Amino acid sequence: MQQRNTPVEGTAARRNASVAVAAGTVLGLVALSGGTAHAATPTDHGRPVAQIIGGTEKPDGSYPFMAALLIKGKGKPLDRHFCGGSLLSPDVVMTAAHCVDDVKPKQIETVVGRTVLSSKKQGHLRNIRTITIHPRYNGDYDVAFLELDKPVYGIAPVNLPTPGTDALIRPGSKATVAGWGNTDTEVPTHPDRLRAVNVPIVSHIECKATYSNYNKKVHVCAGVEGKDSCQGDSGGPLFRTLKGRKGVYQIGVVSYGDGCAAQGAPGVYTYTGSAQLWDTLWKSAEGKRVKRLLNR
């Protein structure tokens, strides 16, 4: 299984390898050889990582709340990209904990509102001031918060569900997942342009039957054969719009899955409507700081 970069044993995270390795070895090889190498990501606790499978390219300006996490360096943005994220407030980007576990703020940067990674004219590039990982992260509670060095204005952040409600994750309802992750289950292919795919929400019962470590209190499943997130999409948002309401509601953070877009193996997301996710965060010293940044 893979993390859409990689947590819990037996599954895979959906990010693109280790920041430490990429910052040193990968970017060094690119500089010396003139070749290309896709960035790696941090430790994933044994689970698999994610990319968009079965999706379509999005036009410039689509989903401006999307964030791309990049390893700092001289390489091309596509080669330095390792995870996704979403703008939660002008000062905070939310991503997966496994993307930034054991990573120092000075090692990475993020760009918000960019559709094409190579287009430096698009979006807002920001350094990272602090990284806060959920205090209960151990594969579950796979969420982290990046405090930006400067606010991002002019882009509407995503909305979050009311904690404790399951109204937005009814089985069969449709949501969208977006990212710059792998697009081919056989040959790793990482796109320069943002891609997205619509996926159905899968019941807790079905997900538990597939993943023994699935925790319905903090997880939600989505995807169908041929349509899924994949490696490189980790940390990105699973979201939907609501009739009669403005903006986008993020219901999940890309976490892990068994392969990508495989039959009977939907992607697993950290559920952002989980009361337990937020209650346990707010009670921690780190969480109190995030709460202040989000004005909650």
Briefly describe each language-model feature range.
Residues M1-A40:
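Secretory targeting and sorting signals
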Residues V30-Q51, R292-R296:
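C-terminal region of N-terminal signal peptides and the immediate post-cleavage residues
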Residues A40-P42, L87-V93, A97, I108-E109, ...:
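C-terminal subregion of chymotrypsin/trypsin-like serine protease catalytic domains
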Residues H45-K74:
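N-terminal activation segment of mature serine protease catalytic domains
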Residues P64-M66, K72-P90, G139:
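A conserved glycine-rich beta-strand in the N-terminal activation segment of trypsin-fold
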Residues L69-K72, V93-A96, D101-R136, E206:
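Conserved H-D interstitial segment of serine endopeptidase catalytic domains
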Residues K72-K74, H98-D102, G113-S118, D149-G154, ...:
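Acidic glycine-/aspartate-rich tracts in secreted/extracellular proteins
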Residues L125-N127, D140-E225, S274-T280:
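Chymotrypsin/trypsin-fold serine protease catalytic domain
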